[in-house]
């Protein structure tokens, strides 16, 4: 008897083979999607760090060694300020303005706000209101931020360190932090060797 068609065993074997192919394909797809997600997160982190590094390096490179005043008009104790254990850095920098009628010198403050490293840019070098600034979130999920200053071959945790250094800019600025289970260390060179003359 010659019947045309498939036997039950042939159909079952075909279904088992198709099921194995489907499981392998879904595992490959799941693995590919996970790899793509991890790669995208790492790329976003690299872009975030690169942009933050560019912004702070530009501001430090264009740092202006001029007297600063607090929000009450009193002279600050330095031209670049970072008090110990505050995780912030305050200085004046030259930032291009849309209008030539506005001074390009603006006060900037880099600070750890919660777990985010942010930049506050004030509208002038000596602002009269502590609330008149724009805020840029540079790096998210930062911990263990430390800022150090090189002076006479020694790293210091605050600036200025004395009356003599209050009119100077440190030779180097080091910013260290921890993000995504990695330690980062940036060394910034202000390249300003002269002291402020009054």
Question: How would you describe each model-predicted region?
Answer:
Residues 27, 33-128:
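Extracytoplasmic beta-strand-rich oligomerization domains located immediately C-terminal to a leader/signal peptide
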Residues 2-29:
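N-terminal single-pass transmembrane signal-anchor helix
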């Amino acid at each position: 008897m010659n019947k045309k068609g498939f036997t039950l065993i042939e159909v079952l074997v075909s279904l088992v083979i198709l099921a194995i192919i489907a499981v392998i394909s879904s595992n490959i797809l799941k693995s590919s999607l996970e790899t793509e997600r991890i790669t995208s997160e790492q790329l976003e982190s690299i872009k975030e760090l690169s942009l933050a590094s560019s912004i702070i390096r530009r501001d430090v490179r264009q740092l202006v060694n001029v007297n600063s005043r607090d929000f009450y008009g009193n002279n600050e104790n330095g031209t670049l300020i970072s008090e110990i254990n505050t995780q912030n850095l305050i200085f004046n920098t030259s930032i291009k303005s849309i209008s030539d009628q506005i001074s390009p010198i603006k006060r900037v403050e880099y600070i750890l706000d919660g777990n985010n490293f942010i930049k506050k840019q004030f509208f002038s070098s000596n602002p009269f209101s502590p609330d008149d600034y724009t805020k840029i979130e540079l790096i998210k999920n930062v911990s263990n931020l430390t800022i150090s200053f090189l002076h006479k071959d020694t790293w210091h945790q605050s600036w200025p360190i004395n009356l003599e250094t209050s009119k100077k800019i440190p030779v180097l600025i080091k910013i260290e932090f921890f993000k995504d289970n990695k330690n980062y260390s940036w060394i910034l060179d202000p390249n300003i060797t002269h002291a402020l003359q009054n």
